[in-house]
Amino acid sequence: MGKISLMLRQIVCLPIKMYQYFISPLITPCCRYYPSCSEYADSAIKHYGVIKGLLMALNRLSRCHPWSKGGYDPLFPNDKN
């Protein structure tokens, strides 16, 4: 992985980390999935890169709503809880 790619991933993940540290502790946990959507997005971007990771995160966020069943939704399908 090149330095530019690594820096880009860190820059894109910065707002996620800021949300996790500053906003998330102040609100009631409401994510219907495990791992949480912010953890999922951070991991997806770090593992798959910015473009595919963001697309995966957006897909996940679109499924996280009050009418969603939720549950265990790992980044890697073969992960066991």
From Swiss-Prot:
Location within or outside the cell: Cell inner membrane
Entry membrane topology: Peripheral membrane protein
Top-level taxon of the source organism: Bacteria
Keyword Nucleotide-binding assigned: no
Keyword Cell membrane carried by entry: yes
InterPro entries, A to Z: Membr_insert_effic_factor_YidD
One Gene Ontology term, aspect cellular component: plasma membrane
Signal peptide: none
Keywords recorded for this protein, A-Z: Cell inner membrane, Cell membrane, Membrane
Family that this chain belongs to: Belongs to the UPF0161 family.
Task performed by this protein: Could be involved in insertion of integral membrane proteins into the membrane.
Name of this protein: Putative membrane protein insertion efficiency factor
Organism placement in taxonomy: Bacteria, Pseudomonadati, Pseudomonadota, Gammaproteobacteria, Legionellales
